[in-house]
Amino acid sequence: MPEFQDVEFIRTELKTGLTFSNIALQAKDAAKISRNTANARKAYDTLLRFMDRSMLSDEDLAELDPMLVRLKANLLELGEMV
């Protein structure tokens, strides 16, 4: 069973990554796009490493997977190779 803190960390990191990627997608300023894309990518990379080590329940995966898919799609749209 995963630790509650693990799931909360992953959930928070996903929301943070999605926020940064959404800001980048809506931005017009190149520096803002670049900065927020980089932050979203850091969140995504951290998530992949952390999720690899966490034993998430099926219920947790059902909640978190769609958010991870959305973050990956946003990063692809921003030109990231994920």
Where do the protein language model's features map onto the residues?
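Short, charged, amphipathic alpha-helical segments
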Residues: I33-K42, D60-V69
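Secondary-structure edge/capping motif, primarily at the C-terminal ends of alpha-helices
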Residues: G17, S21-A31, M51-M55, L78, ...
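Inward-facing hydrophobic residues that define packing positions of alpha-helical scaffold repeats
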Residues: S21, T37-A40, Y44, M51
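Eukaryote-biased recognition of C-terminal alpha-helical segments
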Residues: A62-V82
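Acidic, Ser/Thr-rich low-complexity linear motifs
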Residues: P2-V7, R53-P66
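Short terminal alpha-helical segments
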Residues: M1-A27
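Generic short alpha-helical segment signal, independent of protein family or function
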Residues: D45-L48, D52, V69, L76
